[in-house]
């Protein structure tokens, strides 16, 4: 089920966000609000939360359009929709590659911040992170690899391979513009936030993080 795949991937993405919040919280507890890792962890978490809302929201809408156009969300029945649904294919490629952490999309930037925070936390004398903490970046890298793999398979199973009209309840067709306008807007934000991340980080996220630090002090 396409929506099931996206739902399970949301669990992993939320795990990434909570990991960054956890790094920020631990750093704040041991080093205070002036810790660079505290600010970096919370900025990365909020940044990825917004990025995730853009690419995953678009993917769920695109999946709904595919379900409406073909009558099914079963991956085994889908395939070969590239020439039939070219606009949906383009939107899916952009948002899925963002989810996989491929540049120049916004998911790459927040995943880079996540991996950077995971590596930096091992250099701090926090609990036993200088020993057991070496596992954190390794687990993060493995998780990122799995995310990339299922993201690519998501594209391949839907749009490539052989088209099987006999397996579909309806004759496949491109989604209407009314159904495409919302994912187009979100996909545009994926590109804009990837190319111009300062729109979010410098104008919204970093001031909010600094305000929290001042309140805590």
Give, region by region, the residue ranges found by the protein language model:
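Divalent metal-coordination and catalytic microenvironments
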Residues: 1, 11, 52, 78, ...
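Predominantly late transmembrane helices and immediately cytosolic-facing juxtamembrane segments
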Residues: 56-60, 134-171
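Alpha-helical transmembrane segments of polytopic integral membrane proteins
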Residues: 17, 56, 60-63, 72, ...
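Interfacial and helix-entry/exit segments of alpha-helical transmembrane bundles
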Residues: 7-17, 67-106, 112-122, 129-143, ...
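Hard-cation-handling environments
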Residues: 173-217
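Alpha-helical multi-pass transmembrane bundles of energy-transducing inner-membrane proteins
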Residues: 2-74
